[in-house]
Amino acid sequence: KNGQTTSGSVNVVSGTTSYSLTLSFVSSTLNNNEWSVIKSVSDAGQGANYWSIGDRKAVTLNGTVGKLSLSNVTTYAFIIGFNHNASVEGANRIHFQLAKTALSGGTDVCFCDNQYGPDSGWSSPGAGYFVMNASNTNSGGWKSSQMRTNICGTSLSSYSGTIIAVIPAALRAVLKSVTKYTDNTGGGSDTASYVTSTTDLLPLLSEFEYH
């Protein structure tokens, strides 16, 4: 129970054949489940039958994201949707957002570095900080932004210095990608052909998703 698993074997009536089984026991309390169990439920497309939007699970962060160092910082990921835009983004997904400060109640967490402060005219702090790009440009759009490549992370095999690096290994092992469509050219022109797809593991919400 409570998101644990067990293994065993089952003998058929004839007694001549056996099958190995791994049983996953799913808790209706999201935080009581291992990430591997949550993935199994997601794979089966059954997330909404066990949990609800807003349910939370503890995520302890360790390591460095850009210029921000984190040491045993416990936050709470929360569900924001099940199979959102499945025909476009990918099926059998449970969509989470980072993060809240508590398992219930609490406040939203905003990750920032030592360059955060009042906006007195934009001056680039350079690469590796929590800015969309290292200079005042949107060339290349979301796809080429330093926020996507250097802060959020795009790879499960090369992720040093990104958010992917600081989440628990158990969570990293079950991350699923989604397909996002954004303007990946930039320059301010409202041109439909500029909208192309990217494969993302930890995307930012779009303006319309926030609203």
Locate each region found by the language model.
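Structural motif
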Residues: K1-N2, S14, L61, L70
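Collagenous Gly-X-Y triple-helix signature in extracellular proteins
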Residues: V26-H211
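Structured interaction patches on ligand/partner-binding surfaces of diverse proteins
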Residues: N2-S24
